[in-house]
Design a protein with these regions (language model features):
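N-terminal export/targeting and maturation segments
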Residues: 10-86
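Extracytoplasmic electrostatic interaction patches
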Residues: 77-167
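Phenylalanine-focused residue identity feature
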Residues: 4, 48, 56, 99-102, ...
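Hydrophobic membrane-insertion alpha-helices, especially the h-region
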Residues: 1-12
Length: 167
């Protein structure tokens, strides 16, 4: 009986210590992710589930582009506004690159709404069809910090190929 109480206490403490407002990548082995990958084709997709115990007025998604480590553009590509309605407690953000057409599809859905947009990538870049490409994203649960911008995925391109150092 004592072991059960201790185990239960540890489980409750761990649950209470987890962030209440968080975003995390959807499990790659989940049914949702496998379905999304089939629909997205060869370039794959990235899915993020968010949860918020607090109310908020808006959710913004920005697209930032960097060239040789310097930011060259920063634009808002999605805004979900909850000014006149109750904000969502949870939702899903999906980013699907289409490297052949040089676009990225962005989908956001929650209990109250759904939204989809497509944004161009590598606009005006010569020989972009020959670039090496890759993608990376957050892997663990991250606390949502209000009034800040937090990176989720990164689409990576390189004219002479793509390489990175594991850290």
């Amino acid at each position: 009986m004592g072991v059960f109480v201790i185990t239960l206490g540890i489980m409750v403490c761990n649950k209470l210590r987890q962030p209440q407002n968080y975003i995390e990548a959807v499990d790659p082995d989940s049914v949702e992710m496998k379905t999304a990958e089939l629909l997205s084709g060869i370039d794959g997709t990235m899915m993020f589930r968010y949860n918020s115990k607090d109310t908020f007025q808006a959710l913004y998604v920005y697209l930032s582009e960097y060239y040789s480590g310097k930011q060259v553009s920063h634009k808002r590509v999605l805004e979900l506004s909850y000014e006149d309605v109750k904000s969502a407690k949870n939702g899903l953000i999906v980013i699907t690159p289409d490297f052949d057409n040089f676009t990225a599809k962005l989908i956001a859905a929650d209990e109250y709404s759904k939204y989809m947009t497509e944004t161009p990538i590598l606009e005006g870049v010569a020989n972009r069809e020959y670039y090496g490409r890759s993608a990376t994203s957050i892997e663990n649960k991250s606390t949502i910090e209000y009034e800040t911008e937090q990176g989720l995925p990164a689409l990576i391109y390189g004219e002479q190929g793509v390489s990175s150092l594991p850290i």
